[in-house]
């Protein structure tokens, strides 16, 4: 499950990072590069606030469900609300809830679950992330070609589907974790 989350977590932020400017243009933004600034601000906030929440007792395994759920909602919001401002709001939300440490928390959770094989499990999760970098960008390229002007919106939907799959994996993982804890 954690390996699959490595794939889906990477997909969520990477697809957005690579396609947000085209989405901004489609939605009529005068300066679509602003999306990247909001995305980066989201990442910085996520790192700081998530660390504080962890110190207060939030479990990383819970973040693996909560953060992708918010990212999923942000992707759908950007799909349905086609105005320039939503790109900046969505950029911040994806930066925070997708790029702000979900992959790293998946890796640390894997290390916690497999303490004797930390190196191996880290490598496998990161290999899944690397495969996502290659595979989903190729799919996004195809969607962009097939979708024409609407290509960025098709990519949002594809991203939402992959993120939803990651949420299912995270829920299953949480249920197993709870069962093992009892």
Report each predicted region and the residues it spans.
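Symmetry-related core transmembrane helices of the 12-TM Major Facilitator Superfamily/SLC fold
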Residues: 154-174
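Intracellular juxtamembrane helix-capping segments at the cytosolic ends
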Residues: 100-114
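Hydrophobic core of transmembrane alpha-helices in multi-pass small-molecule transporters
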Residues: 7, 86-101
């Amino acid at each position: 499950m954690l390996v699959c989350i490595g794939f889906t977590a990477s997909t969520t932020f990477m697809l957005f990072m690579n396609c947000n400017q085209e989405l901004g243009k489609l939605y009529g933004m005068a300066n679509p590069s602003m999306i990247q600034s909001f995305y980066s601000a989201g990442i910085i906030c996520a790192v700081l606030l998530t660390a504080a929440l962890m110190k207060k007792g939030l479990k990383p395994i819970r973040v693996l469900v909560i953060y992708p759920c918010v990212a999923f909602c942000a992707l759908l919001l950007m799909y349905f609300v086609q105005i320039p401002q939503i790109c900046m709001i969505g950029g911040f939300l994806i930066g925070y809830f997708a790029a702000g440490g979900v992959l790293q928390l998946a890796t640390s959770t894997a290390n916690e679950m497999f303490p004797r094989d930390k190196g191996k499990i880290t490598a496998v999760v990161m290999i899944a992330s690397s495969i996502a970098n290659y595979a989903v960008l190729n799919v996004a390229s195809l969607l962009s070609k097939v979708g024409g002007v609407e290509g960025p919106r098709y990519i949002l939907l594809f991203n939402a589907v992959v993120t939803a799959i990651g949420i299912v994996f995270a829920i299953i993982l949480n249920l197993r974790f709870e069962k093992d804890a009892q």
